[in-house]
Regions:
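Acidic, surface-exposed loops and disordered segments
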Residues: 1-249
Length: 249
């Protein structure tokens, strides 16, 4: 395997960082790598906010669910789906772009663009010996995040990313087997096979937790997912997204 593939396959989330800031050169390289990601129709419909102000980082750490690694890391990035720039383009070119930038299609484009950029950033950071952790908790209270980061309409903070020097490393979590996520020619709809594969994966995940905790935990993947999905989390999202004039057409 080449170094790129080894870096990708060695990914694990880091939640314990040294209190050591990244250099500007490191930040610049990570952002440049993010910008090199594919983007739909050259729209580049995202922005990246680097949060260096300690007070803002501490506020964000509280808002996202009291996650200390949001405040203590080398650098904290927030990746935003951004169509505000395109509203400005409409003004500059004297073209009414209201309907397109408020459409579901352009909303999806912006979220995908932000996600592709973020994954490039993650790969770049890890190739530099740094650790990363995506922070979906940014979406716990988007109104508060919006106030902290002063984002305008047509800009949605999608997730954060803590980056820094790992103080400790977690084990890599086993992923779903390839045969369960890769399908050729058509979607696999054999429910019995589907369930059999998930039961096999449950054994792998339970073994992972048992080894990691000395036998104290034997969580299954389906059990974890069922517990998470039965909670009505972030049900305000549709209304908030409409409030900032996205995904309403």
């Amino acid at each position: 395997l080449n170094q790129v593939i080894e870096t990708l396959l060695n990914h694990r989330s880091v939640r314990d960082f040294e209190d050591k800031p990244l250099t500007w050169e490191q930040v610049e390289t990570i952002v440049a790598s993010a910008q090199a990601a594919s983007t739909s129709s050259f729209l580049q419909a995202y922005s990246i906010i680097g949060v260096t102000d300690r007070e803002k980082k501490e506020k964000l750490a509280e808002v996202v669910g009291n996650q200390p690694y949001v405040a203590k890391n080398g650098h904290f990035f927030v990746f935003c789906a951004d169509l505000h720039r395109h509203a400005v383009v409409g003004e500059m070119e004297n073209v009414d772009v209201t309907s397109p930038i408020e459409s579901t299609e352009k909303f999806m484009v912006a979220v995908v663009d932000a996600s592709l950029a973020a994954q490039n950033a993650a790969a770049a950071a890890e190739s530099m010996g740094l650790g990363i952790c995506y922070i979906g908790g940014v979406r716990n209270n988007l109104e508060a995040v919006r106030q902290i980061l002063k984002t305008p309409d047509h800009v949605l903070p999608v997730f954060g990313m803590a980056v820094g020097y790992p103080a400790s490393l977690n084990d890599r979590k086993p992923r779903l087997p390839l045969r369960h996520v890769y399908m050729e020619n058509e979607y696999q709809q054999d429910e019995q096979l589907y369930k059999k594969q998930l039961e096999e994966y449950n054994e792998i995940v339970a073994g992972y937790y048992a080894e990691r905790t000395g036998g104290k935990r034997r969580d299954t993947w389906t059990g974890q997912m069922a517990s998470m999905l039965e909670k009505k989390a972030r049900m305000y999202m549709k209304e908030f997204v409409a409030k900032i004039k996205m995904n309403i057409r």
